[in-house]
Amino acid sequence: KSNIKKIYNSVMTRADLIIAGSNFIFSHIKKNYSKYLNEKKKLMVIFRGINVDYFDPTTKIEIDEKKLLKKWDIEKDKKIILLPGRLTSWKGQEVFIEAINLVNIELGYEAFYAVILGSDQGRDLYKKKLIRLSEQYRLSKQIRFIDHCKDMALAYKVSDIIVSASTEPEAF
């Protein structure tokens, strides 16, 4: 990072209390901004929480599930494997597609649907690369690329397996 960027980012260390959302962020702050910290400043980790009411599967109704599956062009006759996260190389979408191909070799093709759910945020070249990879493995009928979902709790509920395939440490 440039010196200007480091100085700009150091503004956060001027507070009396600095809260990091993960051990990764805590270590990053200590490593990169230690010269801005002193013994009077307190640095601590408070992990992000989740709203358990929002993710309560009993609050979702079957008609909403059917609408979502129709929107995704999925019949619920097969299992659904979901990879949520914006489209970026370190989120592991390429690894996921390659893994789907390997699972297909073991289970037979089209035994399940795979949903890659997340915005490309203008990275259309990366999305095209993922689509080409899925075509190369002949997975076009099986993999769904979904740009956005307003109801992630519902997306999790209709899915049988949720995958995190990140290839680098997450900030949270």
Predicted regions and their residues:
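A conserved mid-protein helix/loop that constitutes part of the nucleotide-sugar donor-binding site
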Residues: 79-105, 128, 170
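Acidic donor-binding loop of glycosyltransferase active sites
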Residues: 16, 157-171
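Membrane-proximal helix-turn-helix segments that form the acceptor-binding/catalytic region
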Residues: 2-18
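Active-site donor-binding acidic/aromatic loop of nucleotide-activated sugar
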Residues: 122-129, 139-149, 155
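A short helix/loop element that forms part of the nucleotide-sugar donor recognition site in Leloir-type
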Residues: 34, 56-74, 130-131
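A short, active-site helix/loop in glycosyltransferases that binds the activated sugar's phosphate group
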Residues: 15-45, 50-55
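Short hydrophobic "strand-cap" motifs at the C-terminus of beta-strands
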Residues: 21, 46-49, 83-87, 117-118, ...
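Glycosyltransferase donor-sugar binding loop
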Residues: 50, 84, 113-129
